Amino acid sequence: MGIVGKNGSGKSTLLKAIAGIFSPDEGEIDLHGHSISLLSIGVGFQNKLSGRENIFLSGMLLGFERPQIEEKLDEIIEFSELGDFIDRPVKTYSSGMYSKLAFSITAILETEIMLIDEVLSVGDAKFKKKSYEKMRSLIMNKDRTVVIVSHSSDTLRKLCDNILWLHDGEVKMQGTTEEVLPLYEEFMS
């Protein structure tokens, strides 16, 4: 599912509520005990720790045990394309490097629910293509729920079957990508 809306409409707030970072003002969110990960630029890393140390920290915060993380460590590092930077503090990373590492952890340490907040457009063209392909394979797994917030209609058309349109903190429309995106694009133009 994709989520669209102008800046300030509540997209990231909704993802953070689903992830349990804070509670909704009304109603409740029941994830039925499923594991969940939130991929958002600037969320979750300890800047003084190396990329490698942050892989372990992030994995443990997602509910994985150290042996499970160690089993996937090389795959995460390889996918991130960070090379020797993996052992440097993440405070030395560019925003693109930071996002590559965050995406790699989330994509390789597969949780049952993945929340992706505006990060699929970060990185060079090669990494974007690789990220799209990985996301597509994760989405094809029917045992996983993927929710993507993006301002890119092209991204949403490629990856999402359904769209939730938020406006001023309220659901303006929900339906198939083909139904909702044209109306949203017209509204925004």
Sequence positions of predicted segments:
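A short, surface-exposed alpha-helical micro-motif characterized by mixed small hydrophobic
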Residues: 156-158
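H-loop/switch region of ABC-family ATPase nucleotide-binding domains
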Residues: 150-151
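ABC ATPase "signature
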Residues: 174-175
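ABC nucleotide-binding domain "signature motif"
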Residues: 25-36, 171
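The feature captures the beta-strand-to-loop junction immediately N-terminal to the Walker
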Residues: 4-6
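Conserved ABC ATPase "signature" region
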Residues: 56, 68-85
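Conserved ABC ATPase "signature" C-loop
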Residues: 168-169, 184
